């Protein structure tokens, strides 16, 4: 039995290497095109190990946070390890789906999972003290407070999204693994900052009403980009011109599908998030009004 399992693992690894030999994945090779890049797998394993060790050590992490973080980590694996990653080298639409998972599924779920506390609990006490002292220093506090300001985080997310979809940069991701990795890292980093600011990161610097506004405006500018990709009569990314035919699509049709993914499903995610925060805002307003009424009666 172990030999059989090992054989299957070696087969999957071999197919993965063949799928990334410089040629775009073909339909008959898709399900074997898993991407076991150590630069992706090792950080995911380390994050999972630290998080669940921290949960075991602390025993105080709410279940809803554990579920959110687990779902976020699994969605990262789906985007970066599953055949979707290899398919993104052949189809722009798959590439867009991958990006939407990173920015609109993984990032908010990881933020809702609040992993910093479990990560700290997983470390030795001496390390925790040193990290605690380091984050309290003025330079670190200043940098963190700056990049997590709602307007700054919103701007970073906007710049990352629009800059990387400029043809001159996007085309480089199709020919350079390092540029492609930089794109994914910047998308995830910018989205983590944005959702951290939107969900307030635990410090309530921004009310729920402002959170709704930032989500709404982010939804608007991403929808505009999706609409431009969908409605454009011109091909933005010629790098896909010779890779979509095997999948029964022209490059322009593939681009239109990718634009629709950014336009419609992504718009739904922003709408749901905005409605949820709007309901929290109403509850918060009612609570404050009730408190004010009780104070007046006293």
What is each stretch, according to the model?
Residues 1-19:
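N-terminal secretory/membrane targeting signals
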């Amino acid at each position: 039995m172990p030999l059989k399992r090992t054989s299957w693992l070696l087969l999957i690894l071999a197919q993965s290497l063949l799928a990334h030999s410089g040629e775009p994945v073909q339909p008959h090779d898709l399900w074997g095109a898993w991407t076991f890049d150590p630069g992706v797998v090792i950080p995911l394993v380390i994050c999972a190990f630290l998080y669940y060790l921290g949960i075991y050590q602390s025993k105080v992490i709410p279940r809803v946070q554990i579920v959110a973080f687990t779902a976020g980590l699994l969605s990262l694996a789906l985007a970066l390890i599953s055949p979707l990653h290899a398919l993104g080298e052949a189809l722009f639409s798959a590439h867009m789906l991958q990006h939407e998972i990173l920015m609109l599924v993984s990032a908010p779920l990881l933020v809702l999972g609040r992993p910093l506390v479990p990560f700290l609990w997983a470390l030795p006490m001496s390390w925790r003290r040193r990290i605690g002292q380091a984050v309290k220093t003025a330079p670190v506090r200043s940098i963190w407070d700056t990049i997590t300001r709602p307007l700054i985080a919103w701007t970073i997310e906007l710049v990352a999204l629009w800059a990387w979809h400029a043809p001159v940069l996007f085309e480089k991701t199709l020919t350079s693994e390092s540029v492609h990795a930089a794109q994914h890292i910047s998308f995830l980093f910018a989205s983590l900052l944005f959702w951290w600011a939107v969900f307030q990161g635990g410090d309530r610097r921004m009310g729920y009403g402002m959170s709704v506004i930032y989500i709404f405006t982010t939804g608007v500018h991403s929808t505009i980009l999706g609409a431009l990709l969908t409605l454009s009569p011109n091909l933005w990314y010629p790098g896909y011109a010779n890779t979509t035919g095997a999948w029964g699509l022209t490059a322009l049709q593939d681009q239109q599908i990718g634009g629709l993914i950014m336009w419609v499903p992504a718009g739904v995610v922003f709408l749901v998030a905005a409605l949820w925060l709007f309901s929290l805002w109403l509850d918060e307003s009612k609570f404050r009004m009730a408190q004010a009424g009780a104070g007046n009666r006293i």
